[in-house]
Every structure is written in structure tokens, then in C-alpha cells.
Amino acid sequence: MRVTDFSFELPDELIARYPMPERTSSRLLSLEGNSGKLGDNQFTDILDMVNPGDLMVFNNTRVIPARLFGQKETGGKLEILVERMLDDKRILAHVRSSKSPKVNTKVCLDGGYEMTMLARHDALFELELNDEKTILEVLEKVGHMPLPPYIDRPDEDADKERYQTVYNDAPGAVAAPTAGLHFDDALLNRLKEKGVDTAFVTLHVGAGTFQPVKVDDVLDHKMHSEWAEVSQEVVDKIAHTKAHGGRVIAVGTTSVRSLESAAKASEDELQPFCRDTDIFIYPGYEFKVVDAMVTNFHLPESTLIMLLSAFAGFDEVKNAYQHAIAQKYRFFSYGDAMFVTKKAN
């Protein structure tokens, strides 16, 4: 398959640059994988799409204020985007400056904090904080929320709350698991009252999620890796749900990738998973765990629209996106969502 097969024209005004006033006031496009049937809904209508005994799996990662500004020893300005925290003092990061900092040179951050450039690993830089504080403490103090490039505006105070799920619990992501942004505490309670169970996985979304696919053939793409965890508790809940005829509904592509990574690593029955994953899901992939998913609208030619096409069918997804554009749905991280059921192989 060609990467260009997943292209589409999106009017600029459909890119959501701010969230809706209320988390649940987004629209929800439903897509039935088997029939291709579409439905225009409000997000709270998700209550009518789930059944007692279903299990909804959320990604509980917390977005860290991963963008730092500072200058090199030479005085040149630079911007650091944390890709992942290696420990309390060291990070792997993308560095943007006129010239890359050299190994063993110092970087002075806003707020007077200092870092040393330890090594370069391909496109990423390894830096160490020279301070008694931890990296996380410094990020919380002087870091900026790492809004995606297509939002195309500086971060604002409101983003610290809204570019974050209400159930975030595990700091480490540099991008939000955006399907989860539509849920507030009241909706989560209503799902529980309906008899829908919930479970939480962790996948720390990396900046690689915004990297364009740079090859012509889908099969040639090398996926970035991200750290994921699926606990024994989640495994047990999935087994119970499947045994009683319920569906596993993944909230977001990161939850899908976490669960399918665990399944891929398990020989027979699903096992807990706790390590890096570079799973790349594209048409032809057979899903082993997930029956339905909630997801936002994705970028053209992205690995995420490839994942969705694998799940609900290439033609079905193409048609759904054409419908969404015609009906002026809001796209990307702060945009509207879809509720999608799996197409049988």
C-alpha cells in the first residue's frame, strides 16, 4: 500500500485550535465497521453505544510540560522538546537551534537551571540536569505544554488543564491521548452506572507521534517506540469481559496499541506487558483484543489513520472522513471524535 492512499484534503478551518467549552460538548461520528453505516451524534450519546458488561480501556498517562526554552554556552537560543525521561536527571530530547549543541557543553534553561549535553542518539540528544531538583520538578516549574504543531499557537494557561485527561495518573507523555479529552467525571460516573467497567493502561505518547511518514510504501515505515504497560488487573478484566460476552472498547489509538502490543507478545492467553513497543498497525493486521474504539480525527498519511483503516476498513474510513469534512467536524487533538466498531476479517 502507498502512503498516499491515506491522503485527504482538509480545509484549514476544520483544524481545532482550541477545545470546546465543555469536554463532553464535542460531536461524535459513529462508524459501524461491518456495514460502513455512519451516524452523527453528540459525545454524550456514547452512553447509547455501550452496553452493560462492556469494558472501556483508557490510557492514564499524564502530559508533562515538555517544552523548554534556553540558550547554549555560545549564547544561541534553543528549544528542547523532551521525548522521554530516562531517570530523575536525564532526558532524551529533540533540540531545535541554529547549530546543534556539542557533547559536554552546557545549556542554560529559563529559570536559571543548567543541563549538560551528554550524547547524541541519531535525531535525539541525551541531556542531564545539573541541579538538586528532579527533571519533573523543573518541567513543572518552567516547562510549557507541548501542543502539537498544527495547533499553531503558543500554549496558554488553560491548556495545562484541557490538554490533559481528567484521569491522568502517570507522568511521562509529551502528547495527550486525545480521545480521552472528551470524558469528564460526570460522564465516567454515568458509564459506571450503566454497568460499563473501566480499566487503565499506560502508554507514554512520544513526540514521534507527530513525525510525518517519510517513505512511499507503508511497509517501509519504521515506527517510533514508546513505553507501555498493561497490568495483570487489566488482563484479568479483559478475560472476564470476553468470557461474559462483553466488548473491549479502547479509548484512543494509544490504548489500542498498548493492548495489541500485549497480545502480540503473548503466546496464547493475554499476558501483562511492561516495556517499549513499536507496534505498527496497518491494513491487513488482525486485532486480537479490541472490539470497538473511541478516537479523534487523524492527520492525512499518518500511522493513526492507517491503524483506523485496519480496524474498520479502508473504504469505510475514507468514506467516514469525507462525511466528517462535509459535515464540518473539528479535526485533530482538540477536535471531535468517532466511535468505531471493528470490521470482521
UniProtKB/Swiss-Prot annotation:
Cystine residue pairs: none
Subcellular location(s) per record: Cytoplasm
Family statement: Belongs to the QueA family.
Biological function: Transfers and isomerizes the ribose moiety from AdoMet to the 7-aminomethyl group of 7-deazaguanine (preQ1-tRNA) to give epoxyqueuosine (oQ-tRNA).
Pathway(s) it belongs to: tRNA modification; tRNA-queuosine biosynthesis
The protein, known as: S-adenosylmethionine:tRNA ribosyltransferase-isomerase
The entry's keywords: Cytoplasm, Queuosine biosynthesis, S-adenosyl-L-methionine, Transferase
One Pfam family linked to the record: Queuosine_synth
InterPro entries: QueA, QueA_dom1, QueA_dom2, QueA_sf
Catalytic reaction list: 7-aminomethyl-7-carbaguanosine(34) in tRNA + S-adenosyl-L-methionine = epoxyqueuosine(34) in tRNA + adenine + L-methionine + 2 H(+)
Gene Ontology CC terms: cytoplasm
Species of the source: Shewanella woodyi (strain ATCC 51908 / MS32)
Enzyme Commission code: 2.4.99.17
Broad class of the protein's primary localization: cytoplasm
A single MF term (Gene Ontology): S-adenosylmethionine:tRNA ribosyltransferase-isomerase activity
Any Gene Ontology biological process: tRNA wobble guanine modification
Protein's gene: queA
Subunit structure: Monomer.
Broad class of enzyme this protein falls into: transferase
Superkingdom in the source lineage: Bacteria
